[in-house]
Amino acid sequence: MKVIHTADWHLGKILNGKQFLEDQHYILNKLIDNLKEEKPDVLVISGDIYDTSYPSKETIRLFEETIKIINVNMKIPTIITNGNHDGRERLNYGSTWFEFSQLYIRTQLELMSTPITINNINFYTLPFATISEIKAYFDDDDIKTYEQATQKCINHISKIIDPNQINILIGHLTIKGGKTSESERPLTIGTVESVESANFNIFDKVLLGHLHHPFSITDNIVDYSGSLLQYSFSEVNQAKGYKKLMINSKGDINTKFVQLKPLRELEEIEGDYSAVIQGDVPVKNKDNYFHFKLKNMSHVTDPIIHLKQIYPNTLSLSNITFENHNKSTYADFKTTDDPTIIKNFYKTITDEDLTNYQEKKIHQLLNQVINRED
């Protein structure tokens, strides 16, 4: 049996004011092209279909068109769980009759112990839910952490699971030790959100979403597909795609990562402002989404405007001087004279030295201040 595992589409994603729908439409078409060749028995989407619980009409239309092609036209059974970005009720709308075409949208805790059986393989779903929601569902006030909440859910499933069959869990959560990125919204505030992978040993495979790195964790059972696109500059140079599982028998499950090439990537460029403007700094693709980390631009008014004229998808700009500058301690200031403090500050801000004229004027102004205090 062949299973395609994907997650974290984040449809409708906006990064620094840039809408990603065009890029998402492109990468979903790439996924569809691959599905036509792969001819999988099941497609699994492990949450965060949308980037917000209130997606736009255009975003919903993109999702519906994609699923229609995959599930209706190509007749691929599809299992979807919600993530922490999704609006549970909106995603769940119509799920009852969708199942007649083998489109299974599972967002309710009530169904966690009801497997979806396809080709004698049981797919259990653990939809994203908050600690308080899981506590209320089990009427258990002793649940305080995600670890405890997850254990409660797994224990509930274990009561009906058949260990002699192939059992796969689909979920959306953080495994302890997994690689994180800036674009992953925390699952909870004020408590540890990660859980131990050992909780899932009753399953033959666990297909997760939430962490965007396709190799977030190395584990024989637990696996992340990663996101379809790079969604933060912490994901620069990170390959994106999906996972392909070949399930031959219980104990014989092989997983392979399949990379998808996006329309545009996120790219970070570090260097001198003038060199970048003059095109002397190599870039992968001028149409990529850029974060520039530059120096020597204090003389330029609104440098990001000039950058966008050459690199239209410039999303952010930072002064590399600030990032590379070692912070001075209070003790440093106490033992340094005022002119030197000002001189060092100017160097930090502009990456340039004061001219003789500027130093002379600073001395004059400092003397005026001292004389007034006297």
Swiss-Prot record:
GO molecular function: 3'-5' exonuclease activity; endonuclease activity
Pfam families, per database record: Metallophos (PF00149), SbcD_C (PF12320)
Keyword Hydrolase: yes
CDD domains in the record: MPP_Mre11_N
GO biological process: DNA recombination; DNA replication
Keywords on record: DNA recombination, DNA replication, Endonuclease, Exonuclease, Hydrolase, Nuclease
InterPro entries: Calcineurin-like_PHP_ApaH, DNA_Repair-Maintenance_Comp, Metallo-depent_PP-like, Mre11_N, SbcCD_nuclease, SbcD, SbcD_C
Function: SbcCD cleaves DNA hairpin structures. These structures can inhibit DNA replication and are intermediates in certain DNA recombination reactions. The complex acts as a 3'->5' double strand exonuclease that can open hairpins. It also has a 5' single-strand endonuclease activity.
Sequence similarity: Belongs to the SbcD family.
Subunit architecture: Heterodimer of SbcC and SbcD.
Protein name: Nuclease SbcCD subunit D
Source organism per UniProt: Staphylococcus haemolyticus (strain JCSC1435)
Lineage of source species: Bacteria, Bacillati, Bacillota, Bacilli, Bacillales
